[in-house]
Structure formats: structure tokens, C-alpha cells
Curated annotation (Swiss-Prot):
Belongs to the UPF0342 family. It comes from the Bacteria. Signal peptide: none annotated. This is UPF0342 protein SE_1526. Gene3D superfamilies: YheA/YmcA-like. InterPro entries: Com_YlbF (IPR010368), YheA/YmcA-like_dom_sf (IPR023378). Pfam families: Com_YlbF.
Amino acid sequence: MAVNLYDYANQLEQALRDSDEYKAIKDAFAKVKENEESKKLFDEFRETQMNFQQKQMQGEEIPEEDLQKAQEQAQAIEKDENISELMNAEQKMSQVFQEINQIIVKPLDEIYAD
């Protein structure tokens, strides 16, 4: 009997959607979207992050004033309870992804371990 890995991947997707970690992110993000100030801060910070990533990928230097702006945004975000809750939930989900990834790559790790 052939194993269809995609079926298992789809089951994993559903399990992730049913997880407490996913639900916490979904609920926290809803709070961010409902609060105008939180949403604005969140959107600005995401835009700044994407701009940084794009510049890094293109090998461009990030100007000092952009770094300062990002630092100010990060400080404002830390003070926002809604965004802090979202970031904490994202960290927990990230930990789940790391653990799942370790499980997924275990067969390959075992091959190369010898």
C-alpha cells in the first residue's frame, strides 16, 4: 500500500487549525483588527519588516533613520496589549512548527547520522 504524504499533510493542516495555538492567534489577531490603533501599529510594523527584508535580499544597506523608525515602532508595539498577545501566540505556534519540523525531518536525519 502506497503512502500518500499529501493526505497526511492535509490532516496535519486540519489538526493545526483545530489546535489551541492556532485559535489563540486567530482570536488575538481579531482583537488587533478590532482596535484601530493596534491595527495601524501592526500594519506599519509589518510594512517596515517587509521593506527591510526586501532591502536585505537585494543587498541594500538599511539607512540609520529606517532602523530608528523600526526601533520606535517596536517599542510602541511592546506597549500595545493586543499586539503583545498576538506576538506571544505567534511564538507558541512557532514552537509547535519547530517541533513538527523536527519530527518530519527525523527520517532524513537518521539516514545522514551514520
